[in-house]
Regions:
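Enrichment for repetitive, rod-forming helical segments
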Residues: 1, 9, 92-93
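Cleavable N-terminal signal peptides
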Residues: 3-4, 14
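Flexible, solvent-exposed loop/hinge segments and secondary-structure transition points
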Residues: 17-162
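Hydrophobic h-region of N-terminal signal peptides that target proteins for export
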Residues: 9-16
């Protein structure tokens, strides 16, 4: 009797280990944890500091909500808003904010979408093909330098974003 009971329990245990599947009509998506957002922000800030720049870094979640913002000592107050706008621009267009700035430069008048900015330094954060957030950096002497710091931030968590 025990052998029969054990044999009958194997399929039940196997099904239980597969985990619950989402109900029809529900989506599941990856999301940045606070720890990962902090690591990305810190990686960007460290790169900027190593290059001699004092910057602000903003990380947004997929809903455009601020996950974390780091403002280095000695940065201008405006960098907080600009970093957020760069991250938001990268998030909603799902491309580097520098690409959006170049595209907008050819449009007269340029688009005016609340919360966006036509400056480089914002990047989408991807886990595989899925955008899981964005980063914006402001304060370095040049948009390309802001973007390099943002790239370094994402690289700091690249192994965990696969």
């Amino acid at each position: 009797m025990r052998v029969v009971l054990i044999v009958l329990l194997f399929p039940v245990i196997a099904l239980a280990q597969q985990g619950a599947k989402p109900a029809a009509g529900l989506l599941t998506e990856k999301a940045l944890s606070l720890d990962m957002a902090m690591d990305i922000a810190r990686g960007a800030l460290d790169k900027c500091r190593a290059d001699g720049y004092r910057t602000t870094v903003a990380i947004l979640d997929t809903g455009g909500n601020l996950k974390i913002s780091l403002r280095d000592d000695g940065t201008s107050p405006h960098t907080v808003e600009v970093a957020h706008k760069k991250a938001y621009t990268a998030l909603i267009y799902r491309r580097p904010s520098m690409e959006t700035a170049k595209a907008w430069a050819t449009q007269v008048p340029p688009p005016s979408i609340d919360g966006t900015i036509a400056l480089g330094g914002g990047l989408p954060i991807r886990a595989g093909d899925q955008v899981v957030g964005s980063i914006g950096v402001s304060g370095a002497p040049g948009q390309d330098k802001d973007e390099a710091c943002a790239t370094a931030g994402i690289a700091a968590a690249a192994a965990r974003l696969k």
